Amino acid sequence: RRQRQMCIRDSPTGETFTHAELVTFLDAIPSNVLVTLDEAYYHYNRTEDFPRSLELLSSYPNLVVLRTFSKAYGLAGFRVGYFVGSEEACSNLSKTVIPFSTSLAAQAAARAALTIRDQLLARTDAIVAERERVTKELRAMGFQVDNSQANFVWLPRSDAQQLIDYLIQRKVIIRGFPGEGIRVTIATPEENTQFLNVIADYPAIRPEI
């Protein structure tokens, strides 16, 4: 059976698409093609027209939604997640899962994480607030910053390697894509401020588009 995979938030840019765009895409896919929708950054989306994927499962039995405990839940070391869909679609997807890939400890951690929704919301709200602050300050400096709905921001730069080297020399570690840009993970307010103070002194601060 054929499969198509989509990411709700593009990595490394963090940009997303609307509910209507998702429906248009699903309508264009044959019903015998399995569609897996990666929602790893689902909890960081604050757009009003974000894709409401779970509402579509009854209308699109070939759709499976994938989510992880590695991002918002903070369980990256456990490598645990889940998927939701029709019985047939989940059965087909299960055939690709490596046997015994999740430990008992990871399962216990995931179950416990599901019981602390208030803490999850507080944590993600804090990251979103910092994401908006970092984005605003970078743009005020003159950097181009894409509209991210994830826990990171993307700065497109033709001089990415030069900027990567500049930051590393000042002990600031980011994810670099030479010739394309840099992806900066939103951390604590103190760490974000340190990053902003360092990048503010970057000699070629004006973006090269």
Regions found by a protein language model. Give the residues of each.
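Hydrophobic residues in well-ordered beta-strands that form the structural core
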Residues: 37, 65, 102, 174-176
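Short amphipathic alpha-helix with an adjacent loop that forms part of the alpha/beta core around
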Residues: 1-2, 27, 55, 202
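PLP-dependent aminotransferase class I/II
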Residues: 62-139, 143-146
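Conserved PLP-binding catalytic core of the aspartate aminotransferase-like
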Residues: 127-128, 132, 136-170, 186
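PLP-dependent enzyme catalytic core of the Aspartate aminotransferase-like
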Residues: 20, 161, 166-170, 175-209
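Short, small-residue-biased leader/transition segments that mark boundaries at the very start
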Residues: 3-8
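Active-site pre-lysine segment of PLP-dependent enzymes
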Residues: 12-35, 39-70
